[in-house]
Amino acid sequence: MNNPLLSISNPVKFFKPPIPYRISLNTTINKKQKHQSKTLVVKSNKRSTTSLTSSVSLVRRRNNNGDGETTLVKKVGRDEKGQTVLLCALGYWVQGLRCFSWLALNFHMAHCLNLKPSTLQLVQYTASLPMVAKPLYGVLSDVLYIGGARRVPYISVGVLLQGLAWGSLAIFPGAREVLPSLMAFILLSNLGASITEVSQDALVAEYGLRYQINGLQSYALMASAVGGILGNLLGGYCLLKTPPRILFLAFTALLSLQLIVSLSSKEESVNLPRIGEVTPEISSVLGIVKKQFLDLKGIVQVDEISQPLIWIVSSIALVPLLSGSVFCYQTQVLNLDPSVIGMSKVIGQLMLLCLTVVYDRYWKKLPMRALIHIVQLLYAFSLLFDYILVKQINLAFGISNTAFVLCFSSVAEILAQFKILPFSVLLANMCPGGCEGSITSFLASTLCLSSVVSGFTGVGMANMIGITSKNYSNLPAGILIQSLAALVPLWFIHYVPMLEPGFEREGKRAMSKKSRRNRRVGRVIGQESFAYRRERET
């Protein structure tokens, strides 16, 4: 991209990762209830397994008088979990499959509408403008309920808008043959995709915080990568046999399946908290939205959040992309088949999937700044693969254009996508309760805005140096400028934190057994949180 606060009438407070950055939301909490809440005590006589399918979590809280305790038994059945997993996994999988329809759309604009490279790229990045408004969708998803829920209904609305857009492009010839109408339906499609992505990201972030599951964003990216692999593979092959409108229709059918799943899913199965009550000052919808924006503004201004955001946004916006020119060069000058372009994307998505798995298992324990430094260097040098292709240096080494495009064409794009993952995990772990949708959508919005700026800058640079559909002689110079611009963010790499907060806390908790006797010890297994306080031994 993409959380409600606990009910203030409920004296039970769930564990959530501590926010070490003094991020506070001006929520109205009953002081008496807050004063009575003291220590979370959970006892378990049996050794729990690490399975994520445990169905009961017992939480007890003892009051100050010590004469009573409040017990909450939280049941999450296997069927309910399966429904949640299906909803999220299918959503991210379809999100990755959007490349299936977009590959067909790019070939339709380049070959059927005969758009110039700069015009093609301008259409591509103008279509992303609805995604810039993701913070608005995130705030509405955080505070505005639809039918008693505030995540799943927004997913359904977004999927419906996408289905209407792609279905119209498939059925009505005038919708796809005239550029203004084509642009309108593309914008509608991306509006629906934005709403769906924000709701899914918020649902995943909130679910991970509530059940103490760290790094769920990695699995979301894996599902998206699997969808990208299948979408590019089928898209490249189908374009050789069928016109683009058939691919639009097939993707519409897939969206219909996702809509059925989302409509049949109940948000109560996720067992997420609700916003209990609001103060009279914010009782109106506009008041709630205004308060949420103020909370978001206060959170984003914290250095520990603003500095990583500034770096990742700058690292994208400072690079003038020439993706439209390179695409037209590959298809119009090198005459590469759609299957070759699609297969190159498949290989790239396989690389992204492997990188995500390795990151989730090993690399997320590495210093974040060092990891991002290496990835940015690799990204800057991988942009030179297009330079090698345009200058035909690969032929001097006996590598055909087809083989070179298959192996190296998508490396830079995949590294740019992978670079975002550590920042997504970082901000998801730092989200205060009730702002998951706002924070994740703000991240997605800034990333999208930086991509739009990068694309528009690339169009301007292409026009300045004279890159046209009939003259690609200056394309190598533009690619060199791209690569040099990608090195600029390394000058302020210190904005990236050394470690993610979760691993900093784990390092601080690594202490001797003697020290742990007098400290609170916590461990998380699966979805059950155990915490107890030992008295000082005398």
UniProtKB/Swiss-Prot annotation:
Transmembrane annotation, as ranges: 85-105, 129-149, 152-172, 178-198, 220-240, 246-266, 309-329, 339-359, 370-390, 395-415, 447-467, 479-499
Keywords recorded for this protein, A-Z: Chloroplast, Membrane, Plastid, Transit peptide, Transmembrane, Transmembrane helix, Transport
Keyword Transport: yes
Disulfide bond annotation, renumbered to this chain: none
Gene3D superfamilies: MFS general substrate transporter like domains (1.20.1250.20)
Presence of keyword Amino-acid biosynthesis: no
Subcellular location: Plastid, Chloroplast membrane
Range of the transit peptide: 1-57
Gene Ontology CC terms, in alphabetical order: chloroplast membrane
Membrane topology designation: Multi-pass membrane protein
Function: Could mediate folate transport.
PANTHER family reported for this sequence: FOLATE-BIOPTERIN TRANSPORTER 1, CHLOROPLASTIC, FOLATE-BIOPTERIN TRANSPORTER 9, CHLOROPLASTIC-RELATED
NCBIfam families recorded: fbt
Family: Belongs to the major facilitator superfamily. Folate-biopterin transporter (TC 2.A.71) family.
Name of the protein: Probable folate-biopterin transporter 9, chloroplastic
Organism: Arabidopsis thaliana
